[in-house]
């Protein structure tokens, strides 16, 4: 059994999201193992009984490296049963749980989400968590706090199109801040990629995000597109990222920078010697703002 590691970039609109993938490949057959994938099956799994046939498959996969659950809808009972199995899968590296709550009531989602997140808190090999395209709203941000605060091995966090709003965005950012504050002496943050677009984060949560980024200085990609962030928020984010010397990708597409925000970005640019992608499209830079960036 040959093991190989793949790190690839996938374009999404104007942004590039870093994806970490691990594969255990059988040299003879070429088939992949270590992956549980029910992506896009359109399953409606309400209870433990509904999900049991799939859990039987999951339990057989050893070691487990990835789960891909999107395009199905999971209820509280199903998530709790799934969580019981995931707790035992300490080799998990990629938890792709995007788009798993379509049609679920807002009263269901917090308990279901909490079960899944809490099951992964002690997973030291976990590197990527994707919870995008789930309609959490601000009320469902708190169930993620335990995972985001206490699992300090996560390198890639994707939370796009969740309806977090200012309150939910602040909760998530504060959890990341606390995670960094809990690092032991000499221990460095592992967080490298944060994707949190289409969440109406606005200026109200920008300061919390800036404070979090300032603690995770090894970060290489930040994508906060379509969030209604205005020039004051752009300034805060640039200041928070000023010590992130390894930053390679900054995507603030479809926010409102104007001339004032452009000044903040221009001032911060010398702090990012490795920056290769700066996306400020639809940010109302206008000619003066654009000129500042090119000077």
Name every feature range the model reports, one short phrase each.
Residues 2-9, 13-295:
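Leucine-rich tandem repeat or coiled-coil scaffolds
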């Amino acid at each position: 059994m040959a093991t190989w590691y793949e790190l690839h970039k996938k374009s999404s609109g104007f942004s590039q999201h870093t994806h970490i993938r691990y594969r255990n490949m059988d040299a003879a057959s070429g088939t992949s193992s270590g992956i549980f994938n029910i992506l896009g099956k359109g399953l409606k799994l309400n209870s433990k009984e509904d999900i049991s046939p799939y859990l039987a498959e999951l339990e057989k996969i050893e070691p487990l490296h990835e789960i891909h659950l999107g395009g199905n809808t999971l209820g509280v009972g199903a998530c709790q049963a799934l969580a019981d199995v995931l707790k035992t899968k300490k080799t998990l590296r990629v938890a792709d749980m995007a788009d798993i709550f379509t049609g679920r009531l807002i009263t269901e989602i917090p308990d279901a989400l909490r079960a899944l997140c809490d099951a992964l808190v002690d997973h030291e090999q976990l590197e990527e968590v994707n919870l995008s395209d789930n309609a959490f709203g601000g009320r469902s941000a708190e169930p993620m706090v335990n995972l985001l605060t206490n699992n300090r091995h996560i390198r890639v966090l994707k939370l796009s199109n969740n309806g977090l709003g200012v309150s939910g965005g602040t909760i998530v950012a504060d959890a990341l801040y606390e995670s960094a504050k809990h690092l032991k002496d000499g221990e460095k943050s592992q967080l490298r990629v944060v994707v949190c677009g289409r969440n109406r984060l606005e200026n109200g949560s920008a300061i919390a995000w800036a404070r979090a980024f300032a603690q995770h200085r090894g970060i290489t990609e930040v994508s906060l597109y379509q969030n209604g962030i205005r020039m004051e928020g752009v300034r805060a984010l640039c200041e928070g990222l000023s010590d992130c010397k390894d930053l390679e990708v900054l995507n603030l597409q479809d926010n409102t920078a104007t001339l004032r925000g452009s000044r903040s970005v221009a001032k911060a640019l010398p702090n990012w010697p490795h920056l290769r992608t700066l996306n400020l499209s639809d940010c109302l830079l206008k000619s003066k703002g654009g000129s500042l960036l090119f000077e």
